[in-house]
Regions:
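Residues forming the flavin
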Residues: 1-314
Length: 315
């Protein structure tokens, strides 16, 4: 890219899309050298998951035709490795999907990490969310994975990202700014988890600074009911998954960009503004680099190469 004359700017935030009438004229950015405007005949926006809130705001401010996308609200589940060995021995990352009663919303597992570690991530604005990863050499006695409930909104409320952020903020407030952890058995009993109980648990938390508490005090009823019933169903095929000692960390949130209306050449309703859809490719390449999985980075590079070959209009 540098050899082709591309100007790459690091530690620089895009603060605004510049429009005149129904046409995009460029963007405003803010970096180490201060704020400035970059004018262009064509502007490509490719924010990824972390910029979903920013993209939503730009769509509303500039009248960019879009529809609200889904948001995933859930928990990070941690069990002993032996509980998941029937899955881990066959698949590095098993995918389980269910539609539990009474709501029949889609609930799925995601980002399974055998011998992995639960971790904390901080989004812009200080929102603390839970995640998980694994290392090639260093292993724990536990397996962690996400259990996510997909939420869709339409009328009259159509701000799923803001909704999930509020869930995260409330959970952070109960956890004194950090991640909450609770034993599954305590959820079934309708009680919080205490530090002493956590220390005596057979499943030792790999996120040492997680705060023992009550995630049900912050999790919406619909999402919590879906998660509990899904885990009980999974326990039928993976015995021990819904054991009383199983740990649940919250909040695990996955933000997705709005579904911006665009044509086959990625053009939006605003002239000169194009949209790049790299979320899945970026996530897969990032996962390989983050957790040290064998071949992860090569997989990401192959995915990017396939994307380039299949989407020549973007060039």
């Amino acid at each position: 890219l540098l050899d082709a004359g591309v100007d790459m700017r690091f530690r620089t935030s895009c603060t605004q899309v510049l429009t005149e009438g129904d046409a995009c004229m460029g963007v405003a950015v803010d970096g180490p050298d201060g704020p400035c405007e970059i004018r262009a005949r064509q502007t490509v926006v490719a924010t990824g998951r972390r910029g979903a809130d920013w993209l939503d705001r730009m769509c509303r401010e500039h009248g960019i035709a879009h529809r609200a996308g889904p948001v995933d609200i859930g928990v990070r589940v941690e069990v002993r490795n032996e509980v998941m060995e029937t899955v881990n021995d066959v698949l590095y990352e098993g995918k389980l999907v269910g539609y539990p009663l009474p709501f029949k919303n889609k609930v799925r597992t995601f980002c399974q990490n055998p011998g992995g570690f639960v971790s904390q991530e901080n989004y812009d604005g200080g929102l603390a969310v839970v995640n998980g990863h694994s290392y090639k050499e260093r292993k724990s006695p536990n397996t962690n994975l996400a259990v996510l409930c997909s939420q869709n909104f339409s009328v009259p409320f159509d701000q799923p990202i803001a909704y999930a952020q509020k869930v995260g903020e409330l959970t952070n407030m109960l956890g004194d700014g950090g991640i909450l952890v609770q034993r599954f058995g305590d959820i079934l009993d309708g009680k919080r988890t205490w530090d002493k109980e956590l220390r005596q648990s057979n499943v030792a938390p790999t996120l040492a600074d997680a705060v023992a508490g009550d995630i049900t005090a912050a999790m919406p009823y619909r999402a919590m009911t879906n998660i509990v019933n899904f885990m009980l169903a999974v326990d039928e095929v993976v015995p021990g998954f819904a054991a009383r000692e199983t740990l649940l960390y919250s909040p695990e949130l996955k933000f997705y960009s709005n579904r911006v209306d665009m044509d086959a050449r990625f053009r939006t309703s605003v002239s000169g503004l194009l949209l790049g859809r790299f979320e899945r490719v970026d996530a897969r390449a990032h996962d390989g680099e983050r957790d040290g999985r064998s071949g992860g980075q090569d997989h990401g590079r192959r995915a990017l190469n396939r994307y380039d070959a299949a989407h020549t209009p973007f060039a």
